[in-house]
Amino acid sequence: MYILGDIGNTETKIWLVSKKNKIIKKINFSSKEITNNKLSIILKKNNFKFKYVKKILFCSVVPQTFNLIKKFLSKKTNRNCYEVKNLNLKSLIKVKVDYKQVGSDRITNAISLMNGKNNFIILDFGTATTFDVLIQNTYYGGIIAPGVKLSL
């Protein structure tokens, strides 16, 4: 099994996924003020099993929260926990902007749509609304605007 996660400014989502890519469990919780104790309670309450976890991968725009979750999950599973931007993705996707300036959530969105044939304008409605451009497996960047809730 795999643990996949998305740590945003407002919300963190964690999925437990089978080797056949079936979502077994999904948990959402606030990214604000997360502690080891709160994380432990959330995962116990959701009957999260660590025994069979083989790999852990996150995209995160909140480094402090990722570091806390990384240490917690690495300890519980005895596995390394990786962040998408820390992986060498140059052979997977071409990025035409400063890679350091792009959030891993935006890179992950682009990778998820790559098919070599189609071009995409990628919209993501989170705390911020992002608009990104993917042309034939090349990420050209985009813009960030206030999220829907902030705009109301």
Where are these regions (language model features)?
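Short beta-strand-loop/turn "lid" adjacent to the catalytic site in phosphate-handling enzymes
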Residues: 50-102, 135-148
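Short, charged, surface-exposed secondary-structure boundary motifs
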Residues: 36-40, 91-95, 151-152
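A general structural signal for well-ordered alpha-helical segments in protein cores
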Residues: 66, 106-110, 152
